[in-house]
Amino acid sequence: MIRLWIHRVKDVMAVSLLFAAVCSLLGVVGVTTLELPVGENVGQWIWLGKSTLFSAACIIITCLLQLVKRDSLKKVMCFFHFSVYVSWSLVLWGSVEAVWGLRQLYGFSASGHSRYALTGSFFNPGPYAGYLAMVLPVCLHLYLRARKERFVRYKIEKVVVAVAGILILCVLPATMSRSAWVAAAVGCGWVAYMHRDKSKWNVLWKRYKRRFILWGVSALFILMLGGAGAFLLKPDSALGRLFLWKITCRAVVNYPSGCDKGFAFAYGEAQEDYFVRGDYEEWEERVAGSPEYVFNEYLSLALTEGVVVCIIVLVAIGTCLWMGAKRGRYGICGAILSLLIFSFSSYPMYFPAFVVAGILLLLACGVGDFIYKPLILCICLILWIGGYTEKWKQEEDACRKWVYAKMFYNSGAYKVANKSYGEIYPVLKEKGAFLFEYGHSLYKSGFYNESNKYLKEACLYSTDPMVLNIIGKNYQELHRY
């Protein structure tokens, strides 16, 4: 009896440690660094490095427990039911984000952006909505699966995921993110379709075929009206993204194997060439800007890494989806579909939270059951031995000093700001906003040649036309027309 009790305690400990190993990685979504410049994610990367070490420690302890229990080598090395751990970790963090958003809506918590009331742990409501949309299909899958079971455990699961889903649905409409709404609808639609009773649907189809066709046509008409309404909700925003994709496609044609100088350089070059030709519409001139992101991860990948790499990644994702569907992991596949749809008109891969979630979801389709334990140990070794954590720490310290230097810059103490900017330049020399501030501060101080040096570097990382304006002013002051 005592041996059985000890055995169960070890099982509970192993399950808890494995859940902590997965949950800690996905916990990067809850990390906020308000002391850093807006939009900087280096604090989340540092957390990821620490959580990877914690995850590796949990896995090692679990393996030792399993060896003590004399489990088979296969059970020790494999991570069985990996998809379950990922699903419940996503439900947990999705619920935390939903509650976070509700607190912001009711004024109990501060938003991450002064212009928006609802951002969750993000600095923009768009990515926040995308994260909630990714979690919602997982909640629906767990609910539909638990609905068919009569055990008390499944009844508790059904209540928990129902509460999580309701919390997300309370917040998601308030984000005003059309991309996230569509992503959530597609992901949940996939899950509901895969959970259908095939025999019952076949009988109903044969009996009410005409009625179903009529309903389908009506639903299509409603979707078209909804699409038109979504467009009219923020028309310039939609037109702006269409123009952004158009110019990015032209840039991809110019750099089919990828542009090593980055998105900003390739996009700025393509947009300049487009307007120089003069063959453009009035609305294109109105919505054109200097974007920081492509708002389409597929075009972004094709532009920066090449079309071939983009195709390889899409094939790999499609293979994982096929494996997940074959294994009945509909919630995981639904979450991936939501992320894929959201990636079509947003920039989720800019955030560590989406990068980690995307990788874990792909692994949860089947491969993770066999390779996750050695994989996380290898990643831990790469991060710590390769010095990535130290690099991220240096960047975080530099960003803190940047905030300090920005105070002098905004107050007009340019000489003091120049000294601070010069100290952190080696670490932040690939950030367009930093280079522009440094160059502009040098311009205000009268160092025109030095200013142009850094502003020309900024052109590689920023499409902001003000960079070129200041370069022109520098040449004007130097009497070089």
Identify what each model region corresponds to.
Residues Y128-A129, A183, A264, E292-S300, ...:
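Membrane-embedded glycan transfer/ligation machinery
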Residues S109-Y116, R250, D260-L303:
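Interfacial juxtamembrane loops and adjacent helix segments
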